[in-house]
């Protein structure tokens, strides 16, 4: 999903027979509203395969509440320290346990969570520990792969998440997804290939032990560099819809507008077929033995 709002403006201009995207701000905003309207109509309230995302955070001793990503819509799976955490209804949490709950009440049951409001995560029981920072000896970068060396065993695993802090350049810092673990003192993550190597500073790595997969919200396009929320191969759906909205107000062009909306519907039909293939057919099937 790399097609930008700027790309859409240019491609729509070409379809309209124009040499370039408009410079008039009113017309630019008008066409942007068409693209956003098209994206909302195309995606609707469905859980499309490409709207699945994964984020992480770090538990804090004695802290129950954590903020989820701003695009959070609905939870798919939550893991704490690698273990699956079971959802519980908010009213059940209040009705079943002392609130806030005590750890000993959960010794024989699965830890739970519930969501309050739009993106407020509550963990039950309240975490009683937090990951410790691990000192980093060095970070080097080759071809976009950052290799981290720690002074002691880090305890991390492939596809885990960490927070890097204290590094210069700052591109190494922040939430990082571990792409490989060579041994107990080395792991890698992706970084821009132009990032200066090696990193300097007093560097630490801290495990992000709360990992959640979720369905994300569709965000309207605003800046020219914003990318569309659907796969690039279906971008023509947005262009066709915007074209129909643009020419639909021109006398004598109603038929052309209808053709554009029909094109939009056909592309969305293709996207729906791909959704069905991924959800139904692209799954492992247990063989039948005679």
Question: Where do the model's predicted regions map?
Answer:
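Glycine-enriched, solvent-exposed interface loops adjoining structured elements
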Residues: 1-130, 205-290
